[in-house]
Amino acid sequence: MRVAHLLRKLDPAEWSGTEMAIHRLFDGLRSNGVDPVVYCPKLENGNRQDPLVSSGFEVQRFKAFVPVLGLSRQRRRQLISVGGNLMSFDLIASLWRERHLAIMHAHALGRIGGIALTIAKQRQVPFVVTIHGGVLDLPEKIKQSFNTPADYGWEWGRLFGVLFQSRRLFSDADAILTCNAKEAALLQEQFPNKRVVVQPHGVPLEIYRTDQRQAALAAFPQIHNRQVLLSLGRIDPIKNQGWLLEQAPIIFKRYPRSLLVLAGPCTDEPYGEQIRKRLTQPDLQGRVLLTGGLPPNDPRVVGLLQMAAGLILPSLCETFGLVILEAWAAGTPVLSARASGPAALVQNGYNGWLFDLDQPEAFHQALGCTLEQPALAKQMASRGAKLSEQYSVNALAAKLKKLYQELIEERACAT
């Protein structure tokens, strides 16, 4: 069974949770006899080692662009990195030429998703769309920002959205996948006759159970003999590292041995510059470590998780929280802002801590319990580790293969 997977971005330099989840999904699909072929935009620097290619997957890259006039180079890079509604002419021809195609699976919305939908209809193959970042289950502030007219240039590509019916992605899809039960419920309410499936992300537990602390210590000697507080994720306003830096002076005053580690690529350069500027202030200087982006399943990342006294997730929006499962698998306590994804995994006070961003005192109380009661923290992490065992990569991929087979059979019966 050959399945074309459409991605709006696949950049090894900006590898984060979504890319990691997709990579693991492909590993599981291959183990279940599914042949995934990846379609994604070409990179400006084409010399980077592609983790999917290194794993033996076929990756077809196409030319893509942001159809907006008047953009600065920095703004254009930012839109390509996160959130930009890309367009491609190459992709149309490439998908037409794809042989033995059984399923079209888009992991992108907007014009890229619309192109995939259009070609799927023309080729009469089932169309599946996965929502990775949330559509309906978003904080009101983020929804409003999406609906605010862009003031960064003239978007001349609107016609392509109409031509490829990008607004009909959900209504015309054969199945909608989301990793979030709340998102699924909202989608089902809006599309009552549509097949909406909760498809969580999987975790290869053995990777996080293998001791990699020496790899982390060798790469980041600053963490030696420190209470490491790890925030793992791309540097981006949605991930909200700035909020954590606001709390950092209180943390450092109470826990002089603590070291805050921000691990992940920067996908929003203006925000990243704000973070770097803040780190030069006397109250934070030398107390916060920026690692930059690290490759998938890198021993240094695993080692950081294993060395951490706690994983802190201050995100404004988190539709799943893959890093929570990774932390638990590594035996690390979790403290997370109360977004819908983490709230579905973390039972407050049982296997982790949830806090509200507008009540920082609750965060500091949870952090105090984690650092001052290590036996309790270890017990909570152990409970989380048991939950993470339910997210087997192969089992979740087998579930998706079954959905593919059902859609193919239904399409055959309908014709």
Region spans (language model):
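N-terminal subdomain of nucleotide-sugar transferases
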Residues: 1-60, 395-398, 415
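Nucleotide-activated donor-binding/catalytic signature segment of Leloir-type glycosyltransferases, i.e.
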Residues: 272-295
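Conserved acidic donor-binding segment of nucleotide-sugar-dependent glycosyltransferases
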Residues: 348-349, 353-360, 369-374
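Carbohydrate-associated surface elements
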Residues: 182, 202
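A short helix/loop element that forms part of the nucleotide-sugar donor recognition site in Leloir-type
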Residues: 209-222, 275
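Conserved donor-binding/catalytic core segment of Leloir-type glycosyltransferases
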Residues: 222-239, 245-248, 261-263
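Aromatic "clamp/platform" in nucleotide-sugar-dependent glycosyltransferases that forms part
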Residues: 316
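Short hydrophobic beta-strand element within catalytic cores of glycosyltransferases
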Residues: 333-336
